[in-house]
Amino acid sequence: MNDDTSSSNDSRVSDQPAVKADEATVNSGPAKKVVAKAPRKKATAKKATAKKATAKKAVAKKATAKKASTKATAKKATTGKAAPKKAAAKRQAKPASALIVGAGFAGLGMAIRLKQAGVNDFVILERGDRVGGTWRDNTYPGAACDIPSNLYSYSFAPNPEWSRSFSGSNEILDYIHYLVDAFDLEKHIRFNCNVTDLSFQEKAGLWEATLEKGEVVRGRTAVMAQGPLSNASFPNIEGLEEFEGKKIHSARWDHDYDFTGKRVAVIGTGASGIQIVPELVKTVGTLKVFQRTPGWVVPRPDFKTPDWHKKLFKKIPASQKAVRQALFWTHETMAMAVIWNSPLTKVAERLSLAHLHSQVEDDWMRRQLTPDFRIGCKRVLVSNDYYPALQKDNAELITWPIARLAPNGIRTSDGVEHQLDCIVFATGFDVSKSGTPFPVKGLEGRRLDQEWQGGAQAYKSINVAGYPNLFLTFGPNSGPGHNSALVYMESQLDYAVKGILRILDGNLKMLDVKEDVQQRHNRRLQKRLAKTNWNSGCKSWYLTEDGFNATMFPGFATQYQRQMAQFEESDYQAVPA
């Protein structure tokens, strides 16, 4: 990265975004619905109090009977009959309205939307000791977003203080912390709570999350918001454990390691790799970049935000909204180039090749960096400084396949052993296309990881038949190939809130999408996906091993928004409590 961009990674948001928590809402419908139903909830509470009083009298009578009983009663108490009563008392503890797994963008966004809808008794289970999700974990040199900051943020919580058009990871993490403070979310978050099992209890109509330490947390609904980019992935290379030098994954960066003068390799030339290489080449002795497949790289129109922009955004919030809309529609246009094979696809490829030719002079290197697949088939990369970094005197691009790791380095298929002090794995994440990060159990012993062995499927990326009251974020086929993930996320959050309110306000035991509705939805999706660039023949993390696309949404962001705009109750089976 250039000097301006790298310095932005150390910057912090100096002022909080000019939006108040109670003003930050775009959809007041759910909130009004809850307020209107408040009297009914009070009446329900009174009934519950009366029931509790009756229950207490019954318990008192039983206690008196116990005191008056003889040895037979004592024997009865020691045979384990008291234990079920203890368990029953534990189950009577009021469950949360919603269990949210994960405190990254998705989990916090879900919490905000629930609060704005009048639901406050939810709990967020976070496995780490801080919020942030992928932006907490990815702190490698040069880490930044490849979507403009004014689009990679929530529309209901704009930040007029972005320092650059493309912000670094530190600044994005500051924005996430702002969300926690502005919407008073920290009291809802339980840190260091790693969920190991999520099971639906059909009789009670509750979800139970089992934590690593054995504790069970219960909720009427559950939201899986752990995100697809949370588990670091290492390549399946022979001898991985044999290398005696330092091994670092891009998502688990070791800031104590001194790269100065070291012999370093970077494996992986995807989104994280092209950000790491320009930073490491500045300090290492030698840098060897191991490339399996070149990607399409386009320029990044990055610039420092002028102070007058910030002042304008603060004084006239509508001006920032207009900028966001302009960015949104610009990216929507890109869909024609990267999702489908259209005349714009060829235009995009020519622009990318022009970028390559303008920055790389050597013919051999140009050929090695030219993709042989259609643009959009893999993730399009955005960088101004990756190509120049590869041409530094201490850098070398290696395209021979890796045969294995050796104790002192990497051995390639041409028989050369590259001596190294450190290997950086910029190999991305174990994206859950056919499984789940922990067992998720639904009705009648169903397990989501088993059902998704052939590829993940859901209804509108949110609900899965047989798993009532469960809502997914970044679920199957919700990935954008051209626009901001948070645009898609907002549609998911609002849809999930509608479902959760239907369960809570309707006093439902279960709300489960119909199996035939889900199957019909996915047949249509896969038919549309077959015509996209993602399914045009290259190997990418979008697809399973057998070519099933469980990741991307085959359309414009506006089409996804329309899909999520209506909650069709006829698509679900509702079971009253």
Language-model-detected regions and their locations in the chain:
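Intrinsically disordered, polybasic Lys/Arg-rich low-complexity tracts
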Residues: 3-5, 10-91
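Rossmann-like dinucleotide-binding core of oxidoreductases
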Residues: 88-95, 99-105, 109-130, 224-359, ...
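Beta1-alpha1 glycine-rich phosphate/pyrophosphate-binding loop at the start
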Residues: 93-189, 291-294, 358-364
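Short hydrophobic core segments
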Residues: 100-101, 195, 216-229, 264-267, ...
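Short beta-strand to alpha-helix junction loop
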Residues: 159-178, 190, 267, 339-347, ...
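Feature captures the FAD/FMN-dependent oxidoreductase FAD-binding
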Residues: 164-230, 404
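Glycine/threonine-rich phosphate-binding loop and adjacent beta-strand/alpha-helix elements that clamp
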Residues: 422, 426-500
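C-terminal active-site-capping segments
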Residues: 487-490, 494-577
